[in-house]
C-alpha cells in the first residue's frame, strides 16, 4: 500500500522527534528475521526505553537531517531498521547486539553517538558503556579503594616509624 504525502510527513516528523530526543542511534538490516522475532525485539525495546522503527530510506534521511545522526545517511540502503536510545546511550546498541547474536540474518550496519559514526565492528564501544548507576558505583568503588589504600599506607608508615624508634 502506497503512503500518501501526509502519511510520509507524519513518519518523518515522528522519526525526527525521536532523533532530537535521542542520545544514540543504531541502524540495522532486518531482512530474513521472522515477524515473531521482530515482535519480541520490539517488546524488549519498549522495556529498555528504545524507539525502533523500520522506515523507508528517503524518509529516514529527511528525518535525521540536521540532527546528530545525519552521519548515518550513507548507511540507509536496503531495508532500514533504526533504533534510538533516549535514556542511556548504549541501550539500543546493547539490545540490537544481543538480538544479532541470536538471529544470524540480522545485521547491524552502524551506530552514531554525539555526531560520530561508529562502524558495526566497533559497536561494542557503545554497547559496553556503563549505565549512570553502574558508572556511579564504579566511581564510588574507586574512591573507597583510594581511601582504604591511603589508610593502609598510613598504618604501615606508623608501624615503620615505631619499629625504627
From Swiss-Prot:
CDD domains on file: Ribosomal_L10 (cd05797)
Keyword Endoplasmic reticulum: no
Classification via InterPro entries: Ribosomal_uL10 (IPR001790), Ribosomal_uL10-like_sf (IPR043141), Ribosomal_uL10_bac (IPR022973), Ribosomal_uL10_bac_type (IPR047865), Ribosomal_uL10_CS_bac (IPR002363)
Gene Ontology BP terms: translation
GO cellular component: a single term: large ribosomal subunit
Example of a GO MF term: structural constituent of ribosome
Keyword tags: Ribonucleoprotein, Ribosomal protein, RNA-binding, rRNA-binding
Functional description taken from the UniProt entry: Forms part of the ribosomal stalk, playing a central role in the interaction of the ribosome with GTP-bound translation factors.
Classification via NCBIfam families: PRK00099.1-1
PANTHER family in UniProt: 39S RIBOSOMAL PROTEIN L10, MITOCHONDRIAL
HAMAP family xref list: Ribosomal_uL10
Quaternary structure and interacting proteins, as annotated: Part of the ribosomal stalk of the 50S ribosomal subunit. The N-terminus interacts with L11 and the large rRNA to form the base of the stalk. The C-terminus forms an elongated spine to which L12 dimers bind in a sequential fashion forming a multimeric L10(L12)X complex.
Protein family (similarity comment): Belongs to the universal ribosomal protein uL10 family.
Protein name, UniProt field: Large ribosomal subunit protein uL10
Organism: Shewanella pealeana (strain ATCC 700345 / ANG-SQ1)
Amino acid at each position: 500500500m502506497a503512503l500518501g504525502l501526509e502519511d510520509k510527513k507524519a513518519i518523518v516528523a515522528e522519526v525526527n522527534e525521536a532523533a532530537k530526543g535521542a542520545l544514540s542511534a543504531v541502524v540495522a538490516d532486518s531482512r530474513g528475521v521472522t515477524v515473531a522475532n521482530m515482535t519480541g525485539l520490539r517488546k524488549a525495546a519498549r522495556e529498555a526505553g528504545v524507539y525502533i522503527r523500520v522506515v523507508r530510506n528517503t524518509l529516514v534521511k529527511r528525518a535525521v537531517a540536521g540532527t546528530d545522526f545525519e552521519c548515518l545517511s550513507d548507511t540507509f540502503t536496503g531495508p532500514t531498521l533504526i533504533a534510538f536510545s533516549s535514556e542511556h546511550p548504549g541501550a539500543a546498541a546493547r539490545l540490537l547486539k544481543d538480538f544479532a547474536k541470536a538471529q544470524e540474518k540480522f545485521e547491524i550496519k552502524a551506530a552514531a553517538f554525539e555526531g560520530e559514526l561508529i562502524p558495526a565492528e566497533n559497536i561494542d564501544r557503545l554497547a559496553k558503556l556503563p549505565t549512570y548507576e553502574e558508572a556511579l558505583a564504579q566511581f564510588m568503588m574507586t574512591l573507597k579503594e583510594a581511601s582504604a589504600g591511603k589508610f593502609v599506607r598510613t598504618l604501615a608508615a606508623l608501624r615503620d616509624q615505631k619499629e625504627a624508634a
